Every structure is written in structure tokens, then in C-alpha cells.
Amino acid sequence: MTTLLALFQRPDGGSDALAEFERRYAGEHLPLVAGTPGLRSTEVRRVSEALGAETDLVLITAMRFDDRAALDAGLASDAMRAAGRNLREIAPGLAMLLVLEDADDLLP
């Protein structure tokens, strides 16, 4: 399984700005992402605490695909391109995207 992980920093503007970001993320962005070909599941989590560290991360989304080829096809799709444009509008400079590959060989 290949995962596209999106980490979101707290927007400037306090709790009102965060509430507006979350409203638009849920109402605009996630419906666009849902139309991505090959997307198996999406999980969204709020960051409640960073143990032993400071963080400005407020939201993390995991989008799972069968493999890297499925992710690449999804990224090239019209749905994901539209989601990317929307993300640049609602969260400019606030997102970091990571591609994660299973590492089961590291587990005992």
C-alpha cells in the first residue's frame, strides 16, 4: 500500500482562520479528493498534542492507494489536479505532502 500524507500547519489568524480552513477543507477540498481514481480510503485527523515537542501542525490526512502506480495515476487525474488548485487557494503554503511506502520488512 502507498499513502499520500498531507500535513497542515495552523493558519495565521487564530481560531477563526482555523475554523474557516476546516470548513473549506471539508466542504470543498475533500469532495474533490474523493473523486480521485484509485483512491482506496481517506482518513483525516486533528493533531491534539505533540509529545515532548512544539508543533504548529493541526490536521493530517492519509490517502491510501494500492501501490505507487495507482498513486501516480491518481495524482495525474483531473480530480487530483482540481484538488491541488483548491488546496493552493484554501491553504497557501500550509501543506506538506509526503509519499509513504509500507516498510513491513522492518517489523519484527
Feature locations, PLM:
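Macromolecular interaction modules
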Residues: 1-108
